[in-house]
């Protein structure tokens, strides 16, 4: 992410099979120039009008963003680094994560993020993943909002206005389009990634299954990494995304109830296909500063079928809502986001745990 000891690692070059046209880095929330490709289908589709993500009257409601950690905690960590040797170990861990995040892909990797209920932090985790991949990878990164009714991905990514939605794009997308055609219908977010909103914030807006399939199939060859913020389960698009993507992330509150519900989802996934669990990652999201479960025991319970289980610590900045500003995240949160992105990419590339080692063994 933009802050953190990542200088020892340089981003890898994108592979030839994935479009190497790198994303621009315009200011957050700025609508790019709409480059209309000359296709007959686009001429039949009316151009949507840009609408704000949040109504103007709510501008003053959002409190000033806070740092993810208190001043005392940050000062304590600085002192420990002065008198201990943990800094080198932390740098090594981040470097390992960066290598995993940056590993080359031969075809686009699509990563689904879902949860069993609203309020688990699904859109927040999707935003963290999208920001992390956009920061570390040199090839194009896309975030797709597949939860148009209740998702908050555009807001979390700092987008101020939305225009084209997934439904709009599905009506005009054409196999002959280049990535430079497509980005005219997308929104840039901090770090160089692109966002495809699910709607213009309309109540009752839905993304039907056919539209989802058209969008995901059409965009895969242009984007090396796609993070999909799905509806909560058991919605049809969410179930389809969990089965058809290369890796899946289940976000659950770090509570006993959340663990129990997520265990049921994992059992369902294992019944659909035994190969789904080794490519699944469960995020235990701490939404309060007081931990309510034993993370180690919860990981043992949820990981029995092969899924990875990673904690996301409580962070004041994330808990406050609004756009995720990576410079305000607590250090533990940045490290957790990097570990999560690395684990998800490993499993998406290798279709299971221990990915790079297993792939290397096959090639040898």
Question: What do the predicted segments below correspond to?
Answer:
Residues 286-330, 337:
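Beta-strand-loop-alpha "switch" segments that mediate conformational coupling across diverse proteins
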Residues 134-193:
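Phosphate-binding loop that captures ATP/GTP phosphates
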Residues 2-26:
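Compositionally biased, intrinsically disordered low-complexity segments enriched
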Residues 321-364:
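NTP-binding/hydrolysis catalytic cores, primarily Walker-type P-loop NTPases
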Residues 214-215, 225-307:
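Conserved catalytic-core segment of NTP-binding enzymes
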Residues 101-135:
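Walker A (P-loop) phosphate-binding motif
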Residues 27-112:
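Extreme N-terminal, non-catalytic leader segments
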Residues 187-238:
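Phosphate-binding/switch loop-helix module in NTP-utilizing enzymes
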């Amino acid at each position: 992410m933009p802050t953190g000891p990542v200088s020892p690692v340089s981003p890898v070059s994108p592979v030839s099979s994935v479009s190497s046209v790198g994303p621009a880095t315009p200011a957050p929330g700025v609508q790019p120039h709409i480059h209309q490709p000359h296709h007959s289908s686009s001429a039949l589709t009316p151009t949507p009008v840009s609408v704000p993500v949040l109504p103007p009257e709510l501008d003053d409601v959002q409190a000033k963003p806070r740092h993810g950690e208190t001043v005392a905690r940050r000062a304590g960590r600085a002192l420990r680094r002065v008198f201990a040797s943990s800094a080198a170990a932390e740098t090594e861990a981040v470097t390992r994560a960066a290598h995993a995040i940056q590993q080359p892909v031969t075809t686009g990797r699509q990563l689904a993020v879902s949860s069993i209920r609203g309020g688990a932090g699904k859109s927040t985790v999707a935003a963290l993943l999208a920001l992390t991949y956009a920061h570390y990878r040199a090839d194009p990164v896309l975030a797709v909002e597949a939860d148009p009714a209740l998702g908050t991905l555009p807001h979390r990514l700092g987008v101020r206005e939305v225009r084209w939605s997934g439904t709009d794009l599905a009506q005009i997308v054409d196999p002959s389009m280049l990535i430079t055609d497509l980005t005219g219908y997308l929104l840039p977010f901090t770090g160089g990634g692109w966002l495809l909103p699910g709607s213009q914030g309309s109540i009752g807006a839905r993304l039907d299954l056919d539209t989802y399939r058209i969008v995901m199939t059409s965009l895969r060859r242009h984007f090396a990494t796609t993070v999909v913020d799905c509806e909560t389960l058991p919605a049809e698009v969410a179930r389809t995304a969990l089965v058809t993507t290369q890796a899946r992330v289940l976000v659950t509150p770090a509570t006993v109830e959340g663990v129990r519900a997520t265990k049921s989802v994992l059992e369902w996934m294992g019944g659909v296909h035994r190969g789904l669990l080794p490519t699944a990652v469960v995020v235990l999201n701490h939404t309060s500063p007081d931990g309510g479960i034993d993370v180690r025991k919860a990981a043992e319970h949820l990981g029995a079928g092969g899924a990875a289980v990673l904690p996301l610590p409580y962070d004041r900045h994330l808990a406050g809502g609004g756009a995720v500003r990576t410079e305000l995240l607590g250090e533990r949160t940045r490290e957790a986001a990097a570990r999560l992105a690395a684990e998800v990419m490993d499993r998406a590339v290798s279709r299971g745990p221990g990915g790079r080692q297993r792939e290397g063994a096959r090639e040898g």
